[in-house]
Amino acid sequence: GRYVNTHNALLPAFPGIHGPRDALEYGVKITGATLHFVDAGVDTGPIIAQVAVPVSDDDTVESLTERIKEAERRQLVTYVGRLVREGWTVTGRKVTIP
C-alpha cells in the first residue's frame, strides 16, 4: 500500500505547513488543495488530485484555511474512495485512476 497526504495549496507551489499564509503573501488569486502520494520529500509525491479555491481580497489566513479545508475534505472522500474501488497506476509522476 501507499500513504496519501492532503496539502493546503496547489502543489508544487507553497509546500510545507504554511500553504495558505504563503499563498496570501505571494498574492495569488487561486490556491487550493492537493491530494498526493507520500514520498521521501516534503510535499513532493505524485499528485492524485487537486481542487481550486479562489483567494478573496479580504481573506485572512484563517478564512482561507477554512475554505481550503472544506474543499480538501470533499476531495479526500471522493478520491480515496476511487482509489479503493478503482485502483491506480503511477507512471513517473503521473497518477492514473482507471
Spans of features found by a protein language model:
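Donor/substrate-binding cores of folate-linked one-carbon enzymes
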Residues: G1-I97
